């Protein structure tokens, strides 16, 4: 029986799935199984996964979303620890070594997670660290309920007993499509035991924000209200700050992408990112000013930038 089951939910991931699987195969710890759950892909994802032969076990399901895919993979797995790796993210070679070591060192831990490097949907680096000041420690439960903690699914290693006890990922809530399964899962896992934080960027997390997703923002807001009602029912008004932070997250990440592009001199890319951030939150004046800067001559833009460039790291997701 392998110590670790690596579960990769994939939907139309033909462009990235090979690199994701190869990053698992390259781990310094080799006591694992890889399970890829294809979520009804219509591209070449399945064909690419099959090229890995018996290194990857393929499970195919009707399109049901990543939460259902993770749970399905867990049901077919046998490892003591579970790792949920998204099909467009990649691990550094030491990810499993560090994460397994953390859980082995303290049987009370329910989950270990690490810092992340951040890239856009095309793999272009945005930042070397997702976790900023004030978030560089394992959270208490009340911190998870009041702040949007930067814990990416791909950056976690989960103790199976804790996963089973919390019921896994939630893929529906009161009949509504559930959009915040990652946040919900972390809260449920923290109820099972403390976390360990590894202060190294051992994965590259790709933030995929495409123009077509802007059309889904009304659904995002509707789902957020459902999530808010659930949190209030379970935890009371103490979780209200988490809902506010969850709403700000897409805007903050887009602003980070725009600032990085602006520093790199890529004005069209910066302009597009700020424009999307404005659509996400039209009441955020700062992003209008940033968008205007992309049209100005360099010298004038720099004179108007104020502290923006120096605050680029603090503008990343979860902190703006």
What are these regions (language model features)?
Residues 12-26:
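Short, well-formed alpha-helical segments that are part of the catalytic scaffolds
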Residues 132-218:
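Conserved nucleotide-sugar donor-binding catalytic segment
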